[in-house]
Regions:
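N-terminal leader/targeting pre-sequences
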Residues: 18-169
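Bacterial N-terminal signal peptides that target proteins for export
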Residues: 1-6
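N-terminal signal peptide c-region/cleavage motif recognized by signal peptidases
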Residues: 14-16
Length: 169
């Protein structure tokens, strides 16, 4: 009995202070007349982080052309395009996986906790650049793990960013 209590106490001490899980639904980038014919698909990804590292695992399907690359971007705020900070491993197909393991500096860890990191997946036919930022195929902001709506639950549009309270940096 006392060994069990000691083991639990040690586990509590060595558990990272910022251990957390994050998730995103990957949906199409904003569509316009140019992109409507070449952008499509869906995906999801999860991130586990201890505040010093993060592990990304995800999948996608239904792209209209093969995936070419995927990145983690840092943005000034959720919903605003940013700059790539990490390259993800991605299956070069219309369906597959994204993954990666990364060391985080303090600014990147704070950005993750504040909902300022997102995943973007690019494909062969998706245009490369909008005037306001990089074009891609699918994207999704990483937020703390949360309930998601089912397929038959109405949403505002093709996808949306959930309104969650995120910790300040």
């Amino acid at each position: 009995m006392s060994k069990s209590i000691l083991a639990l106490a040690l586990a509590a001490i060595v558990t990272p202070a910022f251990a957390a899980d994050y998730q995103t639904n990957l949906g199409p980038m904003p569509l316009d007349d140019e992109t409507r014919q070449v952008i499509g698909g869906r995906g999801e990804a999860t991130v586990s982080s201890d505040g010093k590292t993060m592990t990304v695992k995800g999948s996608f399907q239904g792209l209209l052309s093969n995936a070419t690359e995927a990145h983690i971007f840092a943005s000034p705020a959720a919903g605003i395009p940013g700059k790539p900070i990490f390259d993800l491993d991605v299956t070069k197909s219309t369906s597959g996986t994204v993954s990666g393991n990364f060391k985080l500096n303090s600014a990147q860890a704070a950005a993750l906790r504040a909902g300022k990191l997102y995943i973007q997946l690019n494909s062969e036919k998706a245009p490369e650049q909008y005037p306001w930022g990089p074009k891609g195929n699918l994207w999704g902001w990483l937020f703390p793990a949360h309930e998601t709506v089912g397929q038959d639950v109405p949403q505002q549009d093709h996808w949306f960013i959930p309104q969650l309270d995120t910790p300040s940096s």
